[in-house]
Amino acid sequence: MKTPNILFLMSDEHRADVTGYEGNSVIRTPTLDWLAETGTVFRNAYTPSPICVPGRQCLMSGQLPKTVGCEGWVDLQSNHMTFARQLSRYAYETVSCGKLHHQGDDQMQGWTQRPAGDVHITSNHIANRSETHFQEYSRSFSTFKWSDAKEIKRAGVGSSPCVTRDRFWTDSALHFIDDFFNSAYYDREQGQKPLLLKVSLLQPHYPYQTDHDKFTYYLNRVVPYLDQSVFPHPFLSQRQVRPGTDVSEREIRRATAAYYGMVETIDSQYQEVLEALTHVGENLDEWIIVYTSDHGEMLGEHGIWEKQKFFEASVRVPLIIRYPERFEAKVIDQNVNLCDLFATLCHLAGIPCPSGLDSRTLVPLMEGCAENWANETVSQFGKTNLMIKKDHLKYQNYGVNGQEVLFDLYRDPSENQNFIDEPDYVESVSWFRQRLSQLGHGPNADPNYVNAGYTSDVRT
């Protein structure tokens, strides 16, 4: 079997249940539904951090925030090991079109080409920098920063920077595909290098704006989160937007409709990429196709918008891997993490995976062997806020003086009740607190913490 090409499709802020394949009867996502029907769906996939920069850099590095040292808006060290760098070392042409959100002077991080890059300037680029001056410089580029309820109020028909950039990045991917497989056919070496092509779009990240047709289609079909009880917790209740007070119910409906429209837009743009590959003669059944997002979107649930929380809407992400040459379509319920994609891609490509990662290959699950899977996953926000999910229980710790939270997703799938002090959960809470220390968090943190303790060596 030849070394497989890989298509890595990614979005920004896509909550997992706004997809047809998860049973949402309102949203139109035929492309993602096709991937799900013919691929492997991971129903309990979680981001390592429910915010863009750490989530994406952990995905690329196969390491959790504490391991990689990216617990906020910080740089990934130059020449850090990423799955793109590992694949390129083993002959892959690694090409990224769209958003990466890398910080620091190494804007490639293992990608051999970035036809339409998303370069982010940080203060670490500037010699003899002044942080104050840089903040003013950076602020001049911030044309759509979040500010309380502003994004909800201006939601509707429009063409935000996310919309225009996604169109540009999709077009760049289409041009690259034509050039790589078609235009260069007669002058490239025979036995061309295998390809890793990442197409990473900004939508459905706010601003909540979409085109007229999609907006009007969804406006009276969506069911917005209106009568939401706010969870009584100092962190989980932060940035509440109150229906009828901060924003009107109509404004919430408009923002929800626009969000759905953006999801449909990226679905159609992914279809363009798939059709382009088919047009140049590629058999998609021979490709590994991955789809995921960096985190979810609260969309008004619990009165909260955006992300940054450990509620399911924010921390759970869509994840599909399609490779019909090797795997039958199935749905997997085990807890997995975006960090696991590093080891998985190495395994599927038949190359070694570096040791010392917080990454576990998902291939055994895809093969139907779940007996030895440690059914837990981890997510971190900032330096002190940590979530550990074990089976159906989801524990959260918010630092030395923070209030602990325990959700039971079987008994309370809407996450309205904190079971942390319930007698039935004493043993579970004890286990979570011990695991918290093992992961280098909490008052009894293990000073020798290195990584999550997963075995990531994959030899094929």
PLM feature spans:
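Formylglycine-dependent sulfatase
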Residues: 1-396, 403-404, 413-434, 441, ...
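Residues forming the ATP-binding cleft of Hanks-type serine/threonine protein kinase domains
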Residues: 410
